[in-house]
Amino acid sequence: MNRLFYIFSLIFVINVSAEELTDIQISSPVMDKATISNEAIEEIDTRNAVDGGDLLKNINGVNAIRRGGHGLDPVIRGQSDQRLNTFLDGAMVYGACSAKMDPASTYANVNNYDSVTVIKGTQSVLFGAGGPGGVVSFKRVTNPVAKPEFRIGQNFDSNAGAYTTSGNVVFPLSSNAYLRLNGSATNAGNYETGSGIKPLTEYSTTDYTIILGTLLTDGSKLEVNYSNNRQDKVGYPGLMMDITYSYTDMYTLKYHRVSPLGIFSTMNVELFNTDIDHLMDNTTMRGTTGNGSMFTPTSSDTYGGRVIGAIGSDMRVGIDYEHNTKNAEQNMTMGGMNVFMMHLWPDVKAEKLGIFIEKDTANISYGLRYDQVEVQPHKQDVDKGMMATQLSPNQLYTDVYAGTVTAKKREFDNISGFMRLNKKLMHGDSYISLSVNERAPDTTELFNAKNSSTAMMRHVGNPNLSSERHITIEAGYEGMLMGNHINGSVYYNDVDDYVTTHRQNDNGMMARLYKNVDATLYGYEVTAHRLIAGIDTTLNLSYTRGDDDTQNRPLPQIMPLAGDLTFEIKSAKTNYGFRINFADTQDRFDGKVLDIDNATGGYAVYDVFAGFEPTPNLRFTIGMSNITDKRYATHLNAENLIESGTNDRTDEPGRSLFGSINYEF
């Protein structure tokens, strides 16, 4: 990777010609609101979100895959997991489960963060390698205070018997320095669906953070942050196992320099380290004993950093680096003995080193980045033991793919970039953009090695995959049309070498494998807002279509037309709202692996909510979700493998009364 540093050095000696500049924030590109959503969490969390993925459903165009009561997996424009780059206070997070129990957003306990930023698609190159679906960034924003500030809160949800207690305090250490402590604890039981069943959806989480920061003499800011997240006994009816525990330690150091340094007018430096230890089994919560008992300890450890320098007020250049190590061991009870089966993730190390440049002017924005990605397993040939069902990862790859397929170090040279033209149109702001995004396949897609004596339970990566290449054209508009405030976008994404999962020989009873195909994804998002007789009326609509062009079939896990219609009355101290959440029928699916092999019915579900602020420091909220106690599931929800039997999705919760109280002093 040494050649990257030479290229990086050349970028940093570029002379910039003088031109009329726009105001640019180094941490976030300037763009139309159709492509970026920067939200205060307390403003969009109207129903006590259980985690970051659940919270994101409040943003138009973001859906979620439900596998249980916690760990909701966000989907943006038909893309999820490693097609989204997710940051927690600047730290890039990779989950520790190949079955996606713990998408990165599940480690964001929303009571402990201040804001979330969502960028849809490739509209910036500042946020790491890949991420063709978009960027999700949860942030805490802390500044010096003159006296201690306290906030305490209590949330409840009647259906699952869920209670969350949270607290936040900021202490002044001097006129420029501060100490912030915050934390939360949640316990939830099994929620009841509209049909009256209670799937295994209970969970327990705790989270706390320590932040120490100071303003330096030139106004620059230095901050260190430690976060601890603990999840215990998290049930997943949509998976074969549950979380026994998942423990996360996260460290970040941030330096934002506001005074010039050489050619740079400002500079951001961020370093991070995240360690996740995770144990899943089918014994702790399901009571499985004897033969068939399974447990899998895993880990995902990531460290890295980024340096971004602003040249003038309209250009940013930088470098970022990530190093992730994933390990997982597959174990099973046989003949009354614990048997080590194989390395599910065979000690895989993934490194990403990128350089980038991004520029904004009054009417045009563009960016370019180059990433060198190296992914290498280290235990692909570990001795498999004496039993016939035990194989080394390399033996398993060769067993399920044609020819001799073995794991080796993979290197990818990826180029991504975008160009966006902004223009005033019809009393509003419009844009059109063209982007290219190359994403290297992840650890699971390349080297997963789950074996089983039952063929369809095998889940095997493909060491010979190529990088995806997304080419997207997008257009958007924000302004007034026919008395409505409109915010919308349309997009068309053509993908070469899209990584898809499939069944061996296209047989639903055979192993789950991976391959590259050509694919297209296209759709739209639109928000219309209007004040009618003192009632704020907001309509959100989003639609995505995904096609596997190589196999002439739909892509899996694509949400149909969906949205919500909200009526809200607001005053200085109160708000009252009624919301209709709805989705169309989805009859386009690929039932071989991820989708259930039948269509999903449409639905309409009704919520009411209200908020009260009797004093500036005290706020109450109360509401009821799914008022009619309707049984429904979104098309994205995983199959319920415990209660409901074959071809039945994990249902959404039934009727629930929820509320919160927050007091600041």
Give the label of every model feature segment.
Residues 137, 145-147, 153, 164, ...:
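Periplasmic-side early beta-strands and strand-to-turn transitions of outer-membrane beta-barrels
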Residues 360-365, 371-373, 480, 485-591, ...:
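Gram-negative outer-membrane beta-barrel transporters
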Residues 92-120:
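Short acidic/polar hinge/loop motifs at secondary-structure boundaries
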Residues 21-55, 73, 81:
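N-terminal periplasmic "start-of-domain" segments of outer-membrane beta-barrel proteins
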Residues 491, 496, 584-589, 611-665:
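C-terminal beta-signal and adjacent terminal beta-strands/loops
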Residues 239-265, 297-302, 344-350, 400-418, ...:
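Outer-membrane beta-barrel signature, preferentially recognizing the C-terminal barrel domain
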Residues 43, 52-55, 72-75, 87, ...:
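N-terminal periplasmic accessory domains that precede
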Residues 188-190, 194-195, 199-205, 219-267, ...:
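Flexible loop and strand-edge segments within Gram-negative outer membrane beta-barrel domains
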